[in-house]
Amino acid sequence: MVTVEEIRRAQRAEGPATIMAIGTATPSNCVDQSTYPDYYFRITNSEHKTELKEKFQRMCDKSMIKKRYMHLTEEILKENPNICEYMAPSLDARQDIVVVEVPKLGKEAAQKAIKEWGQPKSKITHLVFCTTSGVDMPGADYQLTKLLGLRSSVKRLMMYQQGCFAGGTVLRLAKDLAENNKGARVLVVCSEITAVTFRGPNDTHLDSLVGQALFGDGAAAIIIGSDPLPGVERPLFELVSASQTLLPDSEGAIDGHLREVGLTFHLLKDVPGLISKNIQKSLVEAFQPLGISDWNSIFWIAHPGGPAILDQVELKLGLKPEKLRATRHVLSEYGNMSSACVLFILDEMRKASSKEGLGTTGEGLEWGVLFGFGPGLTVETVVLHSVST
């Protein structure tokens, strides 16, 4: 007679969860940050608000973003004037866009990841889909399963309304799935479209304007599994540990509320200050078991909520400027894509490391950290181990 413990042992994988492929996708419509204020105030019929426009121009200039990608074109916005008007009822129009486009963009990224992985999609056992862009039932996970032609028995997990920390959350969940289910291959997809948050400017809601200056569209997909098949599957990064914490005294610092007007965005406290003040504690808890306390000796992937967060973290920890190079590059080229950002940064880092012949996928270093920051304030901390290139 077999025991429960024997069954459990047989179900568990041997090695750590490993990222084996990464794919990314953006809409084709690219917006230039330097000319965006002119376009934004024109399309929202707000050109008479000259002082506010100057303020927005300064926000865009300081954003360290060169360009962003957006599904919302001028044509779509002209067809849906309520999306442009500040606080006009527009949820139906927004939902009609995102319930179709979020899975579609996710499919593009997933196909690239599956192609790099090189295995038949029938070997995907689990799907984790994450978006802060709209909600629906059955969800974007179901739509993507259909779009990709995954097995009907694929085990799905749908994460809605998590926000900017969720790139860390999906890795934490995928790690547990891969390590506790022998042979599991988890497809993780984060897909974000700003059609839920786009709206015209208003003098009394400047935090909404911050969002208009920062957010961009993008989707990223990764394949995670334990015990990669030698010569068949290529490991990129190993997931060593993953934790989540709520920062003290940070309630209401970042809020989002789904209303008739779409998803409203609120910044109520000094977010960069709260994060930089507490980040050391998260690092110590994560790296003490490894005997690491020099934050310049590890590679860095931090959710680029905005340039101020990166600047203050850099200052607080005494990081060398090159530590956040991959993070700042993604912010500059794509803007803040919420949950998808950190996966874009992973992709950028492994590609740059290989191109520059740096020896490992983590800029030549062995150990690294991935941070997600978002509503709560919630911080996700993932310890990564790089792989020789």
From Swiss-Prot:
Involved pathway(s): Secondary metabolite biosynthesis; flavonoid biosynthesis
Entry EC no(s): 2.3.1.74
Alphabetized InterPro entries for the sequence: Chalcone/stilbene_synt_C (IPR012328), Chalcone/stilbene_synt_N (IPR001099), Chalcone/stilbene_synthase_AS (IPR018088), Polyketide_synthase_type-III (IPR011141), Thiolase-like (IPR016039)
GO molecular function, one term: naringenin-chalcone synthase activity
Gene3D superfamilies cross-referenced by the UniProt entry: 3.40.47.10
Catalytic residues of the enzyme: C164
Disulfide bonds: none
Membership in a protein family: Belongs to the thiolase-like superfamily. Chalcone/stilbene synthases family.
Name used for this protein in its record: Chalcone synthase J
Species of provenance: Petunia hybrida
Gene name in the database record: CHSJ
